[in-house]
């Protein structure tokens, strides 16, 4: 472990030093006033631990089944786009780190490495995330994932339109990046990132590359045109018929939607508010977790805001089958590449293990709401307190 890197926040600070402001803000920022990203962190304080004493915790197990497969711990590295802007071949670095840790990696539709290239270079448990895009393009991607060995398909449902991210607007961030004097100066102030950028070139939206979309600008335009705001329950049934393996629906924030997805053939759901990047002031998925678990009776996974092992333990105690990591592992990637991701996963694993010992639960599969007390109150500190201080989801 690197000196003075003791938690996820330390990696965020190191990442901030390495990245140009517009790249940092793109991945750190949220929608509009960013109340949602703040709430994603504050919400964990609603639950306090109720430890059980005089329990033998000399031996502890973090192993658990996720969708019927035994894993080293109930975590995944979730889907995030443009990882190549953080570190060269960022998708591959994340996937390899996940494989070494014994957990799945979810490749994004907006990845900088194609579905088939990642499958050729990584032999881990690969999942593929699909946006609500028009069926012709969606079918091609799904069949590529099927034929190259991806085990699970994740449909993201909360991006019918893009979130209004004002940091990006202020920075004039777009794909491809424009080379204004401000951007060039920012790059000069971050030479390590700029040198990587010069050596490896502009990352491509690899799943949208074709003979007609040779430039990144054309790929971004194609992806934008393919977003399908009419995608509905009938389209979900079409996707269910197309994909023969495990199917999860992501982006849900109600127990009723979760139950409907199961009724339509999904094998499970992922509660998510997209890390606060889509709808500002949306509820946290933690606030509907227990109800969704009770209503569906099927695997319920969750993301948005997880930074500590104690956050993860709280979600598991409320019934989540697993937690997906987003910014947490991206901080490690941006700071130190694949090594940084390895280190963040090691930190979180140790944090989970320590929390289990402290609450008197030697086996992670034995977690239950009995270990928690709901305080029902969140931190009401003003949003200005967190801007630029790394408390975003």
UniProtKB/Swiss-Prot annotation:
<dbReference type="Pfam" id="PF01070">
    <property type="entry name" value="FMN_dh"/>
</dbReference>
<feature type="binding site">
    <location>
        <begin position="303"/>
        <end position="307"/>
    </location>
    <ligand>
        <name>FMN</name>
    </ligand>
</feature>
<keyword id="KW-1003">Cell membrane</keyword>
<keyword id="KW-0288">FMN</keyword>
<feature type="domain" description="FMN hydroxy acid dehydrogenase">
    <location>
        <begin position="1"/>
        <end position="377"/>
    </location>
</feature>
<dbReference type="InterPro" id="IPR008259">
    <property type="entry name" value="FMN_hydac_DH_AS"/>
</dbReference>
<comment type="function">
    <text>Catalyzes the dehydrogenation of (S)-mandelate to phenylglyoxylate (benzoylformate). Is likely involved in the utilization of mandelate as a sole source of carbon and energy for growth. Active in vitro with the artificial electron acceptors 2,6-dichlorophenolindophenol (DCPIP) or ferricyanide, but in vivo most likely transfer the electron pair from the reduced flavin to a component of the electron transport chain in the membrane, possibly a quinone. Shows very low activity with oxygen as the electron acceptor, and also with 3-indolelactate and medium chain 2-hydroxyacids as substrates.</text>
</comment>
<feature type="binding site">
    <location>
        <position position="250"/>
    </location>
    <ligand>
        <name>FMN</name>
    </ligand>
</feature>
<keyword id="KW-0560">Oxidoreductase</keyword>
<dbReference type="GO" id="GO:0033720">
    <property type="term" value="F:(S)-mandelate dehydrogenase activity"/>
</dbReference>
<feature type="binding site">
    <location>
        <position position="274"/>
    </location>
    <ligand>
        <name>(S)-mandelate</name>
    </ligand>
</feature>
<dbReference type="GO" id="GO:0010181">
    <property type="term" value="F:FMN binding"/>
</dbReference>
<feature type="binding site">
    <location>
        <position position="129"/>
    </location>
    <ligand>
        <name>FMN</name>
    </ligand>
</feature>
<keyword id="KW-0472">Membrane</keyword>
<feature type="binding site">
    <location>
        <begin position="79"/>
        <end position="81"/>
    </location>
    <ligand>
        <name>FMN</name>
    </ligand>
</feature>
<dbReference type="GO" id="GO:0004459">
    <property type="term" value="F:L-lactate dehydrogenase activity"/>
</dbReference>
<keyword id="KW-0997">Cell inner membrane</keyword>
<feature type="binding site">
    <location>
        <position position="165"/>
    </location>
    <ligand>
        <name>(S)-mandelate</name>
    </ligand>
</feature>
<keyword id="KW-0058">Aromatic hydrocarbons catabolism</keyword>
<dbReference type="InterPro" id="IPR000262">
    <property type="entry name" value="FMN-dep_DH"/>
</dbReference>
<dbReference type="InterPro" id="IPR037396">
    <property type="entry name" value="FMN_HAD"/>
</dbReference>
<protein>
    <recommendedName>
        <fullName>(S)-mandelate dehydrogenase</fullName>
        <ecNumber>1.1.99.31</ecNumber>
    </recommendedName>
</protein>
<comment type="similarity">
    <text>Belongs to the FMN-dependent alpha-hydroxy acid dehydrogenase family.</text>
</comment>
<feature type="binding site">
    <location>
        <position position="131"/>
    </location>
    <ligand>
        <name>(S)-mandelate</name>
    </ligand>
</feature>
<dbReference type="InterPro" id="IPR013785">
    <property type="entry name" value="Aldolase_TIM"/>
</dbReference>
<dbReference type="GO" id="GO:0019596">
    <property type="term" value="P:mandelate catabolic process"/>
</dbReference>
<comment type="subunit">
    <text>Homotetramer.</text>
</comment>
<comment type="pathway">
    <text>Aromatic compound metabolism; (R)-mandelate degradation; benzoate from (R)-mandelate: step 2/4.</text>
</comment>
<feature type="binding site">
    <location>
        <begin position="326"/>
        <end position="327"/>
    </location>
    <ligand>
        <name>FMN</name>
    </ligand>
</feature>
<keyword id="KW-0285">Flavoprotein</keyword>
<dbReference type="InterPro" id="IPR012133">
    <property type="entry name" value="Alpha-hydoxy_acid_DH_FMN"/>
</dbReference>
<feature type="binding site">
    <location>
        <position position="156"/>
    </location>
    <ligand>
        <name>FMN</name>
    </ligand>
</feature>
<dbReference type="GO" id="GO:0009060">
    <property type="term" value="P:aerobic respiration"/>
</dbReference>
<feature type="active site" description="Proton acceptor">
    <location>
        <position position="274"/>
    </location>
</feature>
<feature type="binding site">
    <location>
        <position position="108"/>
    </location>
    <ligand>
        <name>FMN</name>
    </ligand>
</feature>
<feature type="binding site">
    <location>
        <position position="26"/>
    </location>
    <ligand>
        <name>(S)-mandelate</name>
    </ligand>
</feature>
<feature type="binding site">
    <location>
        <position position="277"/>
    </location>
    <ligand>
        <name>(S)-mandelate</name>
    </ligand>
</feature>
<dbReference type="GO" id="GO:0005886">
    <property type="term" value="C:plasma membrane"/>
</dbReference>
<keyword id="KW-0463">Mandelate pathway</keyword>
